[in-house]
Amino acid sequence: MTANPLADVVSRQYAKWVYPEPIVDLPGWLAGNWQWFDPSHAHRMFWPDRGYRPDMKILVAGCGTNQAAVFAYTNPHASITAIDVSQPSLDHHRFLKDKYSLRNLELHRLPIEEAGSLGLDFDLVVSTGVLHHLADPDVGARSLAALLRPDGVLAIMLYARYGRIGVEMMQGVFRDLGLGQDETSLGIVKETIASLGADHPLQSYKALAPDLAYDAGLVDTFLHGRDRSYTVDDCLAMVSSAGLVFQEWFLKSGYSPPSTTGSFHAAVASLPQEKQWSVMERINAVSYT
């Protein structure tokens, strides 16, 4: 029998360890940060042949504590629907909605697998760092794809396998130690991470991961109840399984060979595009895809 996504290991985790770190001051946060896939700045990446449409309908699937509120704030004429399995995350969204009068934001406690029950369709569906936590990510991707309008875009962020090798090594260590999602285990995680040598594979990831500065981020990274990572081929297979057409990487530099005269990069550039991406993800070892 399939576990209820509203009461499984992932929803229990996010009920206790609220993630990401809640934003209290949206304008202050936005002064130095940006959200993945926010059409207020990224619309040309999704629709290169048209300008920004302020009245679009957007679904943020797995909104966490802040993401949909950011979208509603930066796209004030858009209609934003947010779903998540974590009630504390939705409660913080409610706080932000009330504080900033985000009347264009609707909140629902709903798993991605049941998103079709909304009875809506969308110009843009965003799922950032969520599908890789589902019991069956392909089912989740198909559920979201079914909500797209004919010219709609599904924007997904997944863990990239090669950039997370250090993380997966440490996850394995902590599983072998029998650690759980409790304060004692978290203390062991902190002590272990602090003891790693400068050449450990985790160090390059740490430099790109501000989440590791607070407890819920450490739990999410090293003690998660369920996650997996993806290669280029895995990503393309998910897109195909969802009945969609792959458009582009959001962060492109990690997948394309530089324009140099070296023989290696010339050899890579001679490959079919999908094979180029596969080769370069192993060269650059990006953490997110």
Task: Tell what function each PLM region has.
Residues 289:
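Conserved small/polar residues in nucleotide/adenosyl-binding loops
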Residues 123-136:
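A short SAM/SAH-binding and catalytic strip from SAM-dependent methyltransferases
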Residues 16, 21-56:
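Conserved alpha-helix/loop element of class I SAM-dependent methyltransferases that forms part
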Residues 57-59, 66-114:
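Class I SAM-dependent methyltransferase SAM/SAH-binding core
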Residues 153-204:
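Conserved class I S-adenosyl-L-methionine
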Residues 116-124:
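A short acidic, Gly/Pro-enriched loop at the edge of an enzyme's catalytic core
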Residues 138-150:
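A short glycine-rich, Lys/Arg-flanked "PGG" loop and its adjoining helix->strand segment in the class I
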Residues 228-246:
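Short alpha-helix
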